[in-house]
Design a protein with these regions (language model features):
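Core catalytic lobe of class I
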Residues: 1-276
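Positively charged, low-complexity nucleic-acid-binding target-recognition regions
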Residues: 275-291
Length: 291
C-alpha cells in the first residue's frame, strides 16, 4: 500500500513494513533500542504541599513527592544484529531511489551495525557517520565518559540521493572573528559533529517518554534529506519526535511502534502539529513485539 494520510501504527514493524509498497519513503529515521542490557525507565514526579510530607521548604512548609507516571521498555536482545537485519532490509525496500536512512545507535553496537549496513546497502552507499555530542549524565572515573550517540547515514542510490544543504538551519561559527562579517552573520552548515543538548527534564518539549530525542536533531535530518510533501518513516517511533518534526516542516509521516504507551503518546503529540490542523491517524494492527 501507499499511505494517503499520516499514520501512527501499533504493531511489530517486521509485520507492518511489508504491507507498504516499495520506494514509498524519501526519508527513514530509525532509533531502535540500543541493546544496553537493562530496562529503560522514566518517572515523572511532582512536589505537593503536605503537612506530613518528608521534605521541608520555604518558611518551614512541608512537602511530599508524588509519582505522577512511570514508563519503561526492555532494551536487551540475545542477538541484536539478527533483530535488526530483517527490519533494515525492509526499510531499504520501502525507500525510494533518492531516499536516505538515518540509523541512530550508541557506542555499544555502532561498529557492528555499520558492517551490517554495508552488507545491506553496499559500502558505496555510506554517506556519513554523524556524532551527536552532549554533556549530561553520570561520569565514570575509570574510563572516558561516553557523551555521544552515533547516527549512521546510508543512501539508496549514491548517484541520486536528495540532500539540500541550503534548507538546513545554519549554526554560528566557533571562531567568528576568523571569517568575514557577512559569513559570521549567515552562520555555517553543520559538520558531522552535532553539539545539541538532550531534552531538558524541565522543558516544554519533554514528554516523559524514556530515551526521547530532541526535535532539533530531527528537524535537521528532515530539512536536509526530504522536501515538503515527502513521506518520512520511523518504525521505532517512541514518543513520535520524527512525526512532530516532519509535520512542522510540511512533510508526511508514518510512525510505527509496538508499545501501546508510545503509540498513544505519539498520537497525541503529532495531533498538535501540521498544516490545516492535520493529525496522525492511529491504526492498531499487527502483534506487539515489546511493551
Amino acid at each position: 500500500m501507499r499511505p494517503n494520510e499520516d499514520l501512527v501504527l501499533l504493531g511489530d514493524n517486521l509485520e507492518l513494513l511489508p504491507q507498504f509498497d516499495g520506494e514509498t519513503f524519501r526519508l527513514a529515521y530509525l532509533d531502535p533500542p540500543f541493546n544496553t542490557g537493562r530496562r529503560q525507565r522514566r518517572t515523572t514526579l511532582a512536589t505537593v504541599a503536605d503537612a506530613s510530607g518528608d521534605r521541608t521548604g520555604f518558611q518551614g512548609r512541608r512537602y511530599a513527592t508524588r509519582v505522577l507516571a512511570e514508563s519503561s521498555f526492555g532494551d536487551e536482545f540475545d542477538d541484536y544484529l539478527a533483530f535488526l537485519e530483517p527490519r533494515l532490509r525492509e526499510v531499504r525496500r520501502v525507500l525510494d531511489e533518492s531516499g536516505t536512512l538515518y540509523l541512530h545507535i550508541d557506542y555499544r553496537e555502532a561498529h557492528y551495525v555499520k558492517l551490517l549496513l554495508d552488507e545491506i546497502f553496499g559500502r558505496e552507499c555510506f554517506l556519513n557517520e554523524i556524532i551527536w555530542a552532549y554533556d549530561y549524565g553520570a561520569r565514570p572515573r575509570r574510563r572516558w565518559p561516553a557523551k555521544h550517540d552515533t547516527i549512521l547515514v546510508y543512501v539508496k542510490d549514491p548517484e541520486r540521493y536528495w540532500f539540500d544543504a541550503e534548507a538546513v538551519e545554519r549554526e554560528p561559527y566557533m571562531a567568528p572573528g576568523l571569517v568575514t562579517a557577512e559569513k559570521a552573520a549567515r552562520g555555517k552548515l553543520p559538520t558531522d559533529v552535532w553539539w545539541h543538548t538532550i531534552v531538558s527534564p524541565t522543558g516544554k518539549e519533554k514528554t516523559g517518554y524514556p530515551t526521547q530525542k530532541p526535535e532539533g536533531i530531527l528537524r535537521r535530518i528532515v530539512q536536509a534529506s526530504s522536501r515538503p510533501g515527502d513521506w518520512c518513516l520511523d518504525c521505532f517511533a517512541g514518543s513520535g519526535t520524527l512525526g512532530a518534526a516532519a509535520a512542522a516542516l510540511g512533510r508526511r509521516f508514518v510512525l510505527i511502534d509496538s508499545n501501546p504507551e508510545a503509540v498513544a503518546l505519539a498520537r497525541r503529540r503529532v495531533g498538535l502539529f501540521g498544516p490545516s490542523g492535520r493529525a496522525g491517524k492511529e491504526v492498531v494492527t499487527g502483534r506487539s513485539a515489546r511493551s
